[in-house]
């Protein structure tokens, strides 16, 4: 849908062939007395796309552009689809990766499952997504290189890891 909406579906098949997936199950136990209730610290995903599903215990919060944190109450059958940093770069800065965290406020443990998409090899920014109005903001990049960069001192402390890794201009 994303590729089609930008008219670049011709790149989809080869992109899809290089996609690889990580499925992760997560358990958030209840915080003990005097323990912070932060289940998962503030971050953006380094994936291309993340698909999340949770049990009935809420806790995921998304940061708005105004800096407010919003929680939500998905129906039990909902999946949450979030853009990751690789999609931010691929879309030439059009699709922002969601800044999010998990806060444990309930009385029950929280379980979630996440499917994270990554790509093998170099991700190229479609030339159709760059023009005079939208100058190229990211260089072609190695997605697994981005993951390796993220665990370095520079990558983990950068304001925007993907920008620090392969950015041309300051877009974050
Ligand atoms: O558990 C969740 O809902 C989100 C987990 C998450 O943000 C992550 O694993 O990157
Ligand atoms: Fe995340």
Locations of the language-model features?
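C-terminal flanking tails of non-heme Fe-dependent oxygenases
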Residues: 1-172
